[in-house]
UniProtKB/Swiss-Prot annotation:
Transmembrane segments: none annotated. The keyword Lyase applies. Keywords: Glycolysis, Lyase, Metal-binding, Zinc. Gene3D superfamilies: Aldolase class I. The lineage of its organism: Bacteria, Bacillati, Bacillota, Bacilli, Lactobacillales. The active site is at residue 85. Binds 2 Zn(2+) ions per subunit. One is catalytic and the other provides a structural contribution. GO terms for molecular function: fructose-bisphosphate aldolase activity; zinc ion binding. Zn(2+) 1 binds at residues 86, 178, 208. This is Fructose-bisphosphate aldolase.
């Protein structure tokens, strides 16, 4: 299947009691790993770029072209959306212009009324081009690419107002954070999520900071209405651990590769990319989106 907008497969997840993964990419190899995992599991997927990752990779146009061409060259058959994660207003508009099929406008740092007004503007522009829109109420805790939030519970009335702007799925604070979870983290506020989904019945909720949340809490959140789960830190840790292990065992690895010098970056990066693919496949299984393409 070609590159698609995300609203239909996210809504299908909401209606059928599973969640799709929004997996952040950082380069060519990560993109390949995510696509291989999605294809192996026959799962719809959003490949996401943060503003920082897109800058690192050469800009939004480069990211869009890279993902689009890899989907074609790798023969990917599952639905793939190209998604902007936590984008400012100008970034959201640029992504719509260069061919992203899904965007998140994050105006959660703005006063509520301004957030709602700007989101409505983004929705109008995006939907005119067939691009799905995610927006946020209630700051997601932690830090990601310089965006820092204390973490809070999204006000129910704000969530209802945000849904009325015409967005396709809603990121809402329910005690979740970006990055590794501290030992004293109290867990997801599932009771608040239940109230939230009751206020916007049938509407897809997005769980940010999906890395490190216990699987039982993720599954319960999905049962209550979460239809998209974002994953980044988990993939980064998997990549880092595998690469460090490879470097520690350099001589043994060199023998395994028939004595070839391992300064070739393709060999050096391979274990980390395999680990990312494995991490993505494992999350797809937990989210229940395998064989839902």
């Amino acid at each position: 299947m070609a590159i698609v907008s995300a609203e239909k497969f996210v809504q299908a997840a909401r209606e059928n009691g599973y969640a799709v993964g929004g997996f952040n990419t950082n380069n060519l190899e990560w993109t390949q790993a995510i696509l291989r995992a999605a294809e192996a599991k026959q799962a719809p997927v959003l490949i996401q770029t943060s503003m920082g990752a897109a800058k690192y990779m050469g800009g939004y146009k480069v990211c869009q072209s890279l993902i689009t061409n890899l989907v074609e060259s790798m023969g990917i058959t599952v639905p793939v959306a190209i998604h902007l994660d936590h984008g400012h207003y100008e970034d959201a508009l640029e992504c719509i212009e260069v061919g992203y099929t899904s965007i998140m406008f994050d105006g959660s740092h703005l006063p509520v009324e301004e957030n709602l007004a700007k989101t409505a503007e983004v929705v109008k522009i995006a939907h005119a081009k067939g691009v799905s829109v995610e927006a946020e109420v209630g700051t997601i805790g932690g830090e990601e690419d310089g965006i820092i939030g204390k973490g809070e519970l999204a006000p129910i009335e704000d969530a209802k107002a945000m849904v009325e702007t015409g967005i396709d799925f809603l990121a809402a604070g329910i005690g979740n954070i970006h990055g590794p979870y501290p030992e004293n983290w109290e867990g997801l506020a599932l009771d608040h999520l239940e109230k939230l989904t009751a206020a916007v019945p049938g509407f897809p909720i997005v769980l940010h900071g999906g890395s490190g949340i216990p699987d039982d809490q993720i599954k319960e959140a999905i049962r209550l209405g979460v239809a998209k789960v974002n994953v980044n830190t988990e993939s980064q840790i998997a990549f880092s651990n595998a690469t460090r292990e490879f470097a520690r065992n350099y001589e043994a690895n060199e023998a395994e590769y028939d004595g070839k010098k391992l300064f070739d970056p393709r060999k050096f990066l391979a274990p980390g990319m395999k680990a990312v693919q494995g991490a993505v496949e494992e999350r797809i299984d937990v989210f229940g989106s395998a064989n839902k393409a």
